[in-house]
């Protein structure tokens, strides 16, 4: 950064359920020293109220400057996190949100870039893989500095579900969901392990779990958002903590391996889409993808998932407005 500031600054765009939960997670975990919250003009006072409310927790956590921000405040930010978008309603898929949220995304990204922002974009609005792609297109930024939350939450759900099934700590379960953050995602069963022990071997030694149970477990993970939306209207706590984890990895230059929306350049036979796979992430964004050697069935699922995303992108980019706004 060219600014003289000596601390880490995050700008959050979108103070809805996900955004405010993310802000709360940052405060609780002591992540970043400055947090600006941007909302549309008619909701600016909500951002003011949330900033004030969050500031009252600082005496219990760690110092942080929190305020309702403007787009001009993005200029010297290290990270801009986009959660703003139309929420997913009962019965809607994430891909149903494309039309509404691409227009919102274009407006946000344009204003952030116009501020002189030179940091990293982190996208969480849905459909996240498509909106990560559009953020890259509309910003003109290098692909390494545009990151989507990808399958980070899905993988956490998968690990927790396996942990409950096996009666172990989820932190000892190493397993990934890859592909679209949505209906075409898939479990990487071939590399799932418990403390380094292949899942299949672990199951042999510990208990009798049938294949049908594992299929049902994955389906529960895949459909978790629908379950939660039908019961309480929206999902926000899990994704908020996932975003906080990604934020910490970036701001602390951890070079952590996390499952994110990553630009594909031929890995798994996929190109020119952002899609969920593990990647090394640090202060400069995506350092490199971690290309897990998938088996043939998993590779086919990755390609099928990417094909679905590509079809959505191709259809959306028939809109001349999006074509004209593209810088990549």
From Swiss-Prot:
Its EC number is 1.1.1.27. Keywords: Allosteric enzyme, Cytoplasm, NAD, Oxidoreductase, Phosphoprotein. Catalyzes the conversion of lactate to pyruvate. Belongs to the LDH/MDH superfamily. LDH family. It catalyses: (S)-lactate + NAD(+) = pyruvate + NADH + H(+). It is found in: Cytoplasm. It is an enzyme of class 1 (oxidoreductase). Coiled coil: none annotated. The active site is at residue 181. Beta-D-fructose 1,6-bisphosphate binds at residues 159, 174. The lineage of its organism: Bacteria, Bacillati, Bacillota, Bacilli, Lactobacillales. This is L-lactate dehydrogenase. GO terms for biological process: glycolytic process; lactate metabolic process. One of its GO terms (molecular function) is L-lactate dehydrogenase activity. Pfam families: Ldh_1_C (PF02866), Ldh_1_N (PF00056). PANTHER family: L-2-HYDROXYCARBOXYLATE DEHYDROGENASE (NAD(P)(+)) (PTHR43128), L-LACTATE DEHYDROGENASE (PTHR43128:SF16). The modification Phosphotyrosine is found at residue 226. Substrate binds at residues 88, 94, 126-129, 154-157, 235. NAD(+) binds at residues 18, 39, 46, 71, 85-86, 107, 124-126, 149.
